[in-house]
């Protein structure tokens, strides 16, 4: 049931297009949507029954805001802008790899054919993307043999090896006329646009001439080129006599989840496919339209000449915002491909459900055991902290993030503590919690469902104090270890030790989180200690000032690497020959001394 505040705001909603932003109890935006009629759309969240992720969204809405726009198109574009800005938890979060390769004809006096990972504004001509590096490399190799441009590094006064093999036009030893380059560039362009007839005809003629001249090895080479075209181009054709670059989107939805399948059609072929499975927080139509809009707003996204979508999608609105034709095929090959994409999406989603059933007990089920023990709402994201120091110096903290029971290492963070703490765990905790959640608050990012502190009551209460000062409400618990430094108890905010069955998945997850945050902070502390030790040892060498010390640390990183470097390598950093020689001799002596100590220690341990 909607709160009094929400009921009052619902009554004020206009019947106009716009974007709406749902907020949680901390005032953070958790969902952004668009509407042709704000009044009808926003009211639907609170005046109807919902299931799945939509029900979870509504349960977390404590307030909302809206922005009226002049048109549906403006609302669509505004929604996309706000999603990118706030990254709301309940909106689709795209996972593009951006790693598909392209073939580029470079914009140079003597052009080359190269593989490119991204599209650049360098006036080169790009073809692709290709499904993988192997496919792109094979095509590139075929073109280099059939329609050579430049493969060498440029003029060197003599023909290069590639020229003698017929794979370079000779920029290595002569000025190649632009007409020669253009002839082959035109042929390459035709081939990569799917016009293979001319290439097949040319190669067949060359193969016949080679065979008639009894150059059977050369004839076999031409035969292999024909086989390449047949296997990689013609046999993969799914649209006959249609070379228009198209992207095709379809979906399958079940149990509050949706899988989106994308087919990339180039030169009449299904070049590659991409799929993504998402929990629905809105209608399928709204989610799919939002996904497509976000898809083409990503960095390096290449728009095709046309986009194909299933029925009930607002093709007119998408076409206006994407500024390319968007349509729904109703018959023929394109309609068949749309059905094929839906079939693939269904298989993907059904496979996901089977995997979810297998993994739920170990992941989300384990998280639920922990939240149930703490008597807090079930969540999907835990953040854990630990500290490390050397007798009060080099004090560091580290954060690990577990989502749905699994570590998300992209979200891990390391902190050098700024305030003097000595060995005061409370001060260290207060600082790192303040820094972490001030940033999340200021950037409008999603808070975790639970904070776990490695330690006991000191760390727990200090974390709670920091959150109270920030006026942020996040549950906190502590992971307590026994005298054998093993996970023993879960401590709640009231200082109570909560029992978790040591054989349960929840206890096992707690162990993994505690071990992971400890590993991460210790690794960081060792790196920092090594760096500090290196810095102090370099300070012992006469003639090495702060600037030279920093250069040596950045370039080599450790004493053994400096000892292995030549005097010339050290001089290359802008250090004079006399000081460079002194550095080499001094550091070599230090390393030799350290090695003797290590050998003596090992010998002692063996005895």
Swiss-Prot record:
GO terms for molecular function: DNA binding; excinuclease ABC activity. Interacts with UvrB in an incision complex. The keyword Cytoplasm applies. It is found in: Cytoplasm. GO terms for biological process: nucleotide-excision repair; SOS response. The UvrABC repair system catalyzes the recognition and processing of DNA lesions. UvrC both incises the 5' and 3' sides of the lesion. The N-terminal half is responsible for the 3' incision and the C-terminal half is responsible for the 5' incision. Residues 197-232 form the UVR domain. Residues 15-92 form the GIY-YIG domain. The gene is uvrC. InterPro entries: GIY-YIG_endonuc, GIY-YIG_endonuc_sf, GIY-YIG_UvrC_Cho, RuvA_2-like, UVR_dom, UVR_dom_sf, UvrABC_protein_C, UvrC. This is UvrABC system protein C. Belongs to the UvrC family. GO terms for cellular component: cytoplasm; excinuclease repair complex. Keywords: Cytoplasm, DNA damage, DNA excision, DNA repair, Excision nuclease, SOS response. It comes from Oenococcus oeni (strain ATCC BAA-331 / PSU-1). It holds the Pfam family UvrC_RNaseH_dom. NCBIfam families: uvrC.
């Amino acid at each position: 049931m909607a709160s009094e505040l929400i009921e009052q705001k619902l009554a004020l909603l206009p019947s106009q297009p716009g974007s709406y932003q749902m907020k949680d109890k901390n005032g953070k935006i958790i969902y952004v949507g668009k509407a042709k009629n704000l009044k009808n759309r926003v009211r639907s969240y609170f005046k109807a029954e919902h299931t799945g992720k939509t029900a979870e969204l509504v349960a977390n809405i404590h307030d909302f805001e809206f922005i009226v726009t002049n048109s549906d198109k403006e609302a669509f574009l505004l929604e996309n802008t706000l999603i990118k800005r706030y990254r709301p938890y309940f909106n689709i979060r795209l996972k593009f790899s951006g790693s598909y390769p392209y073939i580029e004809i470079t914009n140079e006096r003597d052009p080359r054919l190269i593989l490119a990972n991204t599209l650049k504004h360098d006036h080169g001509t790009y073809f692709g993307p290709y499904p993988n590096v192997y496919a792109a490399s094979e095509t590139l190799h075929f073109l280099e043999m059939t329609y050579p441009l430049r493969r060498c590094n440029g003029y060197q006064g003599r023909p290069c090896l590639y020229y003698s093999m017929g794979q370079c036009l000779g920029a290595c030893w002569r000025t190649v006329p632009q007409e020669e380059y253009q002839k082959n560039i035109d042929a390459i362009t035709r081939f990569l646009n799917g016009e293979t007839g001319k290439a097949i005809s040319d190669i067949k003629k060359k193969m016949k001439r080679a065979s008639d001249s009894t150059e059977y090895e050369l004839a076999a080479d031409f035969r292999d080129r024909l086989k390449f075209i047949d296997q990689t181009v013609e046999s993969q054709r799914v649209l006959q006599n249609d070379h228009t670059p198209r992207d095709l989107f379809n979906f399958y939805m079940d149990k509050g989840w949706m899988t989106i399948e994308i087919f990339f059609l180039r030169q009449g072929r299904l070049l590659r496919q991409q799929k993504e499975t998402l929990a629905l927080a809105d209608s399928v139509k709204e989610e799919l339209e939002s996904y497509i809009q976000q898809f083409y707003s990503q960095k390096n996204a290449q728009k095709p000449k046309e986009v194909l979508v299933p029925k009930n999608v607002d093709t007119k609105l998408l076409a206006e915002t994407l500024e390319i034709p968007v349509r729904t095929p109703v018959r023929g090959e394109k309609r068949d491909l749309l059905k094929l994409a839906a079939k693939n999406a269904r298989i993907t989603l059904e496979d996901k459900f089977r995997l979810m059933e297998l993994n739920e007990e170990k992941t989300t089920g384990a998280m639920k055991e922990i939240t149930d023990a703490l008597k807090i709402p079930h969540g999907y994201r835990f953040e854990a902290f630990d500290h490390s120091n050397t007798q009060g110096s080099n004090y560091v903290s580290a954060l690990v993030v577990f989502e749905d029971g699994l570590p998300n290492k992209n979200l891990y963070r390391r902190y050098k503590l700024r305030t003097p703490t000595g060995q005061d765990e409370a001060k260290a905790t207060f600082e790192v919690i303040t820094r972490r959640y001030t940033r999340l608050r200021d950037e409008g990012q999603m808070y975790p469902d639970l904070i776990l502190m490695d330690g006991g009551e000191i760390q727990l209460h200090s974390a709670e104090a920091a959150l109270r000062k920030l006026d942020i409400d996040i549950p906190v618990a502590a992971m307590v270890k026994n005298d054998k430094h093993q996970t023993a108890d879960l401590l709640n905010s009231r200082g109570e030790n909560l029992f978790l069955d040591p054989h349960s998945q929840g206890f096992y997850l707690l162990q993994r989180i505690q071990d992971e945050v400890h590993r991460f902070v210790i690794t960081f502390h060792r790196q920092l200690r090594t760096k500090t030790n290196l810095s102090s040892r370099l300070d012992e060498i006469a003639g090495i000032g702060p600037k030279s010390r920093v250069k040596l640390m950045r370039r080599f990183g450790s004493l053994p690497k400096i000892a292995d470097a030549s005097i010339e390598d050290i001089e290359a950093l802008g250090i004079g020959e006399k000081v460079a020689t002194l550095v080499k001799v001094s550091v070599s002596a230090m390393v030799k001394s350290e090695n003797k100590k290590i050998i003596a220690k090992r010998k002692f341990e063996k005895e």
